[in-house]
């Protein structure tokens, strides 16, 4: 058995966020490393690695030496948490798209051919495609402290749902202590703390929008409602990944 070093020696990108209410010329940006949420598959004799925000993918014959390939404009290269799966002769790609319907993309060789788009009919975040041994196709998604992990069966040719979406996993922090935020599983934020965070964030968002000559993306009360959920003490349920081993899902 071979063992491989982690972290891997790969180039990755940075993301620069402009700070609202800058305190000085040397404090204009926050800098974040990227290339999270990787999917790794074996496809036609090569390993393929697709990380977030990399605008491309890596290939390797041995999991040690990697080559980078840039993705084309036909695919949403900056959508987070790309999921890549093999179905027949094709590699299928999807990535996170909230607020509008996502799509699936497929190709027989991403190094030399463009991806073909297959429109989807619903939005999703943190997607995971699963092809069962009998050829039936299932799709899972979710990344929220307000929504559960969902699942749905898809038509293998059209990639359209053939069932209604089903709730797979919900948080139950009221009965499962390990799901609770905070040291010693004690909620770290009071209602007053949460409201203060919401007001601070709204103020920052308004300042940034004003600088850019824009408006808030939604009415202020809707934004506040979303922020209250974001800053709440509820745990995030995310990163769905279905696999099958010795007959067990």
Q: Positions of the model-derived regions?
A:
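Carbohydrate-active catalytic/glycan-binding domains of CAZyme proteins
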Residues: 1-249
């Amino acid at each position: 058995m071979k063992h491989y070093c982690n972290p891997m020696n790969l180039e990755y990108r940075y993301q620069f966020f402009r700070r609202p209410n800058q305190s000085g010329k040397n404090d204009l940006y926050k800098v974040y490393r990227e290339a999270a949420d990787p999917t790794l598959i074996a496809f036609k004799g090569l390993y393929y690695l697709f990380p977030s925000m990399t605008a491309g993918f890596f290939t390797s014959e041995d999991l040690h030496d990697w080559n980078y390939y840039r993705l084309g404009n036909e695919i949403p290269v900056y959508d987070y948490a790309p999921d890549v799966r093999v179905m027949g002769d094709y590699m299928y790609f999807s990535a996170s798209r909230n607020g509008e319907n996502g799509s699936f993309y497929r190709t027989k060789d991403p190094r030399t051919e463009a991806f073909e788009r297959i429109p989807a009919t619903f939005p999703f975040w943190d997607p995971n495609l699963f092809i069962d041994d009998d050829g039936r196709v299932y799709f899972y998604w979710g990344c929220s402290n307000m929504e559960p992990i969902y699942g749905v069966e898809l038509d293998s040719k059209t990639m359209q749902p053939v069932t209604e979406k089903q709730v797979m996993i919900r948080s139950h922090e009221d009965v499962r202590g390990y799901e609770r935020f905070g040291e010693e599983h004690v909620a770290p934020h009071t209602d007053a703390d949460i409201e203060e965070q919401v007001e601070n964030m709204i103020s920052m968002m308004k300042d940034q929008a004003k600088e850019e000559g824009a408006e808030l993306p939604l009415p202020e009360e809707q934004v506040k409602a979303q922020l209250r959920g974001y800053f709440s003490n509820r745990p995030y349920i995310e990163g769905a990944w279905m696999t099958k081993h010795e007959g067990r899902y």
